[in-house]
From Swiss-Prot:
Any GO BP: protein folding
Main subcellular location: cytoplasm
Gene from which this protein is expressed: grpE
Entry-linked Pfam families: GrpE
Organism, as annotated: Shewanella sp. (strain MR-4)
Annotated segments matching region Disordered: 1-20
Key words of the record: Chaperone, Cytoplasm, Stress response
Feature: compositional bias, Basic and acidic residues: 1-10
Protein name per UniProt: Protein GrpE
Subunit structure: Homodimer.
Similarity annotation: Belongs to the GrpE family.
Domain of life: Bacteria
InterPro entries hit by this protein: GrpE, GrpE_coiled_coil, GrpE_head
Keyword Phosphoprotein recorded: no
């Protein structure tokens, strides 16, 4: 075998090996490119999944806050309903209390013929006031106090030397409140103060 034929044979082997290596390299590059695309896809899917988790976490926090608000409102509504459930019933009792007050005012406790009736009505009135006070009903009797339009209803005004201006001088009908909430204002006569005095100035 001549040197030339050996060299030609070696060149052929070298070309085959190079061709095989370049095919393997191309195949590896192709696989790496596909792997990189797949990694990018997976990273994007992971980022999307994490974003969804954050979104769901935010939704859960909002839902929990909403549930707390609903619970709080429901508890307040129940408390308010319990506190003021007696309002209608208490309003129905007010005329009874007024009639007892009138009966006491119209009866002379010193008169022997009506003394027993007076004492009976007085005891009944005290018992009823004690019973309704247990449920938060309290009378408003502003005699001698400053006029308060939030709790008093002025029937009229009169001059008075005894009471300063804008003072309740007479309670026509007591007012009542239920758990510090006004059931009925007290009907009152309000003082205008003392009669106005004319001042004579002689020059």
């Amino acid at each position: 075998m001549s040197n030339e034929s050996i060299k030609a044979e070696q060149d052929l082997i070298q070309e085959g090996v190079e061709s095989e290596v370049s095919t393997e390299e191309a195949s590896l590059i192709d696989e790496l490119t596909q792997a990189n695309f797949r990694i990018e896809e997976l990273e994007q899917l992971l980022a999307d999944a994490l974003a969804k988790v954050e979104e769901q976490k935010d939704s859960v926090i909002r839902a929990a806050a909403e549930v707390d608000n609903i619970r709080r409102r429901a508890a307040m509504d129940v408390e308010k309903a319990n506190k003021f459930a007696l309002e209608k019933f208490a309003n129905e009792l007010l005329p009874v209390l007024d009639n007892m007050e009138r009966a006491l005012q119209g009866t002379n406790p010193q008169d022997e013929t009506t003394k027993a009736i007076y004492e009976g009505v007085e005891l009944t009135q005290k018992s009823l006031l004690t019973a309704v006070a247990k449920f938060g009903v309290k009378p408003i009797d502003p005699q001698g106090q400053a006029f308060n339009p939030d709790q008093h209803q002025a029937i009229g005004m009169q001059p008075s030397a005894e009471f300063p201006a804008n003072t309740v001088m007479l309670v026509m009908q007591k007012g009542y409140e239920l758990n510090s909430r006004l059931l009925r204002p007290a009907m009152v006569m309000v003082s205008q103060g003392g009669p106005s005095q004319e001042i004579n100035i002689e020059a």
